[in-house]
Each structure stands twice: as C-alpha cells, then as structure tokens.
Amino acid sequence: MKEHSIDIQLSHPDDLFHLFGSNERHLRLMEEELDVVIHARTEIVQVLGEESACEEARQVIQALMVLVNRGMTVGTPDVVTAISMVKNDEIDKFVSLYEEEIIKDNTGKPIRVKTLGQKLYVDSVKQHDVTFGIGPAGTGKTFLAVTLAVTALKRGQVKRIILTRPAVEAGESLGFLPGDLKEKVDPYLRPVYDALYQILGKDQTTRLMEREIIEIAPLAYMRGRTLDDAFVILDEAQNTTIMQMKMFLTRLGFHSKMIVNGDISQIDLPRNVKSGLIDAQEKLKNIHQIDFVHFSAKDVVPHPVVAQIIRAYEYSTEVAHD
C-alpha cells in the first residue's frame, strides 16, 4: 500500500517537548499504537504511514495541542485517552473531558474524567439522588465515586461519607476468616482505601475515619439506619441479594446522594440467587431521580504496557484456537 505523509505545523518550538514529553516517549507511544512513523523537527511534525493511520495521528496530535495551548501538562494518560478515542471515532469529544477539574488529589494533581463514559457518570451523579454505575473492572467507577464523595464533603454539601459493600467473595466464605464482620470486610474494600489515600492522603483519611466523618462498613451495618446529609457508596453491588439492595436503597435520607457500583459479569452469589443489581435495573429504571450509567470496555484506559499485555494474551488465545 502506498505510504502517505502529513505535515503538521506547530506554533512554537517548545510545543514539541510539551506534546511528546521527555525522550519523546509520547511520540514513540503514538507510533506504536497508531502504526505510523513520526519525525519531529522544530515546528513541523511529519507523520508517515497508511493514509487512515496518518489521519488518526493528526487528529490525536491536534487534540493534544489544544491542551498544550491552554497551558496544560500533557501526560501519558492523556495520550492514551486520545489514542483510544480516535480508535473509537470519538476524538471530537476529547477536549470536552478537560473542561472541568473535579478536585485535586493530595499531591495537588488535578483529577478529571478520562473517558466519555466517566463524564456521563459524573454528570449523572450531580443531577440525580441515586446513580448506578454498571460495567467492567478498570473503568474507574470506584475511584470516581470516592472522588465525588470527597468533593461533596469538602464543599459542605454533605456531612459524612459512608462506603460499603456486601461481604461475598468468589470461592471464599467470610465465615472462616478471623475477626468481627468489619475486620472481615475491610480487606475487600482495598480499592476504596486506595482511592481515599490518593485523594486525601493517608493521614487525613485516618483522621476523618476516627471522627466518623468517613465510615467504611459492611452492608449489614446499614440496616435500620436513615442516612441524612451523607454521600453513600455501595461497591460490588452485583453481589447483593434483592432484599439487601432494597434495604440499602431505602436508607436514603434527606440531603444525601447514593452511588451503586457493580459489574453484572462478575456475580459471586449462589446460582439460584438473583443479583439485587440486576433486579434493581429492571424495577427502578423509570424512577425520575434514579439513573443508570453503563460503562463498556471503551472506558477502560490501561497503562500502555498493560494494553500490550492484554493484546498478547488475546493473540495467544486466538493462535491456540486455530
């Protein structure tokens, strides 16, 4: 196939560094992921390859240059997101992901959505009392939920954060683990702790938990309570029974928000027990202040090496089947 060439004019020599990063790591990433060759010379970027691949590279570079021209720092996750969006024919919406900063993490780094699915999710939480986030692992559901909860707490919109999940895990009975129920469920809430530590830092998280402003508890602890002025997150909701889900949702109090996250492809309940998450989708879809946001594989933005590992395993599986 005939090789195509595109020249892209930059506005300033410094743009090359801001665009491609130290040691041109972003340039190499674009070459690898888009199957093109890129030559960067002062204020001209030349892209070589098949016409469609060159066009994708041009769109990625121009989208990233919008961020550069706004004085924003372009990091590897931004490049990965742009590449993912151009492959999904969504690059025209890339810049909209950067219109709003949700909050800064404990190092001062801004936290923003990374995919259109994440943007829909954040917008839904702002507009609804109860938001269900349904989709595969790695889509950022837990991290975003905790981020939105901390943001609401810092703005004085709620007085406390409550994080919970059902005590069910694949192939493992919690009845055989030592300690009380809270101690048993805590190891399975690790993603929640990780998110809190990244956003608030470990010390502030610990202080807020000691003051019971942040509460991390098993789902069983929610029974009989009415949760006013609270931001309540239920994680791993696919493993709730119908009665557990009903019990949880009816805890909603005044001036509160609820997020229910789960992945219906990873249900660990006994085969004859219907998931409360699937049941809720069917029963609650027409309630005005409840919204369902569905994530897909497009919302998984892995590290470039992880993306290559996944592809290698997929290729290996295909070869094995041939």
Regions found by a protein language model. Give the residues of each.
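Intrinsically disordered, low-complexity mixed-charge segments
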Residues: 2, 8, 72, 90-98, ...
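Short amphipathic alpha-helix segments
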Residues: 15-32
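Compact, well-ordered interaction domains used in eukaryotic information-processing assemblies
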Residues: 28-29, 34-37, 43
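Interdomain "pre-motor" coupling segment immediately N-terminal to P-loop NTPase/helicase cores
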Residues: 39-98
